[in-house]
Amino acid sequence: MADHPARILLVDDEQSVQALLSYPLRKEGYDVVQATDGRQALERFEEQPFDLVVLDLMLPKIDGLEVCRRLRTHSSVPIIMLTAKSEEIDKVVGLELGADDYITK
């Protein structure tokens, strides 16, 4: 068993989504670190290790697809894309860039 709770990087620019997801995760004992834009997500990822990344696609500064692409250049951390974009092409692109799963809000 791990010495620390699993650490999740939750990346979404909507406060309501952040609150909706982070509360139950924290209640279950996960360490949730939040980022509100793509640049902040990449900075947080460089600062500490994560066990999972939950990533929105439509983000300010750097979009979620680019964040995913950059993370995949040096990490195999599981990435779940959580987005309002429900077109099949969006899912295909996200998975091809290295996301492990794609969930529509």
Would you name each region that the model predicts?
Residues M1-K105:
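N-terminal/domain-start alpha-helical segments
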